[in-house]
Amino acid sequence: KAHLFDINVKNGQYFKESDTLTSGDHATVFDTEFGKMGVMICYDIRFPEFARTMALDGARMIFVPAAFNMTTGPAHWELTFRARALDNQIYMLGCAPARDTQAGYISWGHSIVTDPWGKVMKQLDEKEGILIEEIDLDREDQIREQLPLLKHRKSEMYHL
């Protein structure tokens, strides 16, 4: 986890991860028999540069265990997964806890898989469930060939 979730939403939720956690200092990309995969945690998905770093490091998929709350979940959950998938032409997989209205922190839920075209392949609701979806890495390659966003980047123009 590189980015700590410290928020105070007016008429919404207050939460400060920095009270108990220390942020990481690098992106995590690892080798598997299917290719490289990345992992980011929850709030990290809100930083496009972090997903881009993983994609440029060769990640074919990024796994995101996350627990968006009842304020940010409805507004941003699906949107951020679709945007990171589309921006990087990569599969994004979000795993979220089921909603428990009796808990101190109430999660939005809605585990999700998005494809490199930015399409939601499958999404659960707020209840307990298991999300199973077949990932086609050849489709990722085809999308990157047809619309070569990463190759067309002009990194010399960007101030990151």
Task: Describe each PLM feature range.
Residues K1-D57, M70-L79, L147-L149:
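Active-site catalytic loop in hydrolytic enzyme cores
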Residues F5-N11, I130-D141:
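Short, surface-exposed linear segments at secondary-structure transitions and domain or protein termini
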Residues Q13, T22, M37, P116, ...:
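Short, functionally important structural connectors and interaction interfaces within domains
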Residues K36, I45-L131:
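CN hydrolase (nitrilase-like) catalytic-core segments centered on the catalytic cysteine
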Residues D138-L160:
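A short C-terminal boundary segment appended to hydrolase-like catalytic domains
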